[in-house]
Amino acid sequence: MSAKIISGTEIRKEILGEIKDAVTEMKDKYGTVPGLVTILVGESPASMSYVSLKIKTALSLGFYEVQESLSVETTEAELLALIEKYNNDDSIHGVLVQLPLPKHINEQNIITAIDPDKDVDAFHPVNIGRLMIGGDDVKFLPCTPAGIQEMLVRSGVETAGAEVVVVGRSNIVGKPIAMMMAQKGIGANATVTIVHTGSRDLATHCRRADILIVAAGVPNLVKPEWIKPGATVIDVGVNRVGTNSETGKAILRGDVDFEAVKEIAGKITPVPGGVGPMTIAMLMKNTLASALAHSS
């Protein structure tokens, strides 16, 4: 029997509907709406497309949205000055700088320049520290890990006491989702193992998992024989493996051999249509949370 598909597209619709209702309520109560500035440096097609989607989503929810499109020759000092401007702008509740940046700009300097209380990507060291502490100290959750946790909760996956194996140790996905799953709370309380390129016998670790979260960036890395029967498999990978000759669009594959693994797993996310749609939804949720914190 094939696994149940966890659709990030459908869950995203639910979340955006809830956010839109909350924005209407906020406007009625406080006379303001969430404000988000998106800052893009250069003309990378992938970054331009992603920023465009973020802007479109924000506007559809009734946010106040400001777009700053800067030349690839913009200096680090100029970018820092622009961030400072929006840090001090009370109409802006979220400051988002699209990564990656041109090589002459130090990304960490830019991330740390953003006001932690407007850091809706949750990349600032202060927000990473708050995540480590947990509880009421957490203002924002990193967007992709938050999307994963939301998918687990809304699809009825029991996490308390579960064996969770995270494949990948990036600062954006692997480390934060492992930390979040180990915390006390809803969608957490799990026993977590992180595995990576330096781990021995990857398959053995994966076979222990009640919940397997794969963020390795290697297409079709995880095979069906790595899966515990009935496990929940969350595939974070988005790998371009070619181009469709008829449509000209990229062919995407996850880190999991989806067709084979779905015959073993109990629940599984597809690529595309799984974790991907959740990331922007959680960015909007963070921006709303920031706006409410600044307004109340």
Swiss-Prot record:
Record-linked InterPro entries: Aminoacid_DH-like_N_sf (IPR046346), NAD(P)-bd_dom_sf (IPR036291), THF_DH/CycHdrlase (IPR000672), THF_DH/CycHdrlase_cat_dom (IPR020630), THF_DH/CycHdrlase_CS (IPR020867), THF_DH/CycHdrlase_NAD-bd_dom (IPR020631)
A Gene Ontology molecular function term of the record: methenyltetrahydrofolate cyclohydrolase activity
Superkingdom of the source species: Bacteria
Position of the signal peptide: none
Chemical reaction(s) catalysed: (6R)-5,10-methylene-5,6,7,8-tetrahydrofolate + NADP(+) = (6R)-5,10-methenyltetrahydrofolate + NADPH; (6R)-5,10-methenyltetrahydrofolate + H2O = (6R)-10-formyltetrahydrofolate + H(+)
Pfam families named among the record's database cross-references: THF_DHG_CYH, THF_DHG_CYH_C
Keyword Oxidoreductase: yes
Claim: Mitochondrion is one of the keywords in the record: no
Alphabetical UniProt keywords: Amino-acid biosynthesis, Histidine biosynthesis, Hydrolase, Methionine biosynthesis, Multifunctional enzyme, NADP, One-carbon metabolism, Oxidoreductase, Purine biosynthesis
Pathway it works in: One-carbon metabolism; tetrahydrofolate interconversion
E.C. numbers: 1.5.1.5, 3.5.4.9
CC per GO annotation: cytosol
Binding site residues for NADP(+): 168-170, 197, 238
CDD domains named among the record's database cross-references: NAD_bind_m-THF_DH_Cyclohyd
UniProt GO BP: L-histidine biosynthetic process; methionine biosynthetic process; purine nucleotide biosynthetic process; tetrahydrofolate interconversion
Subunit note: Homodimer.
UniProt-listed NCBIfam families: PRK14168.1
Family label: Belongs to the tetrahydrofolate dehydrogenase/cyclohydrolase family.
Role summary: Catalyzes the oxidation of 5,10-methylenetetrahydrofolate to 5,10-methenyltetrahydrofolate and then the hydrolysis of 5,10-methenyltetrahydrofolate to 10-formyltetrahydrofolate.
Name listed for the protein in its UniProt record: Bifunctional protein FolD
Naturally occurring in which organism (per UniProt): Desulfotalea psychrophila (strain LSv54 / DSM 12343)
Gene: folD
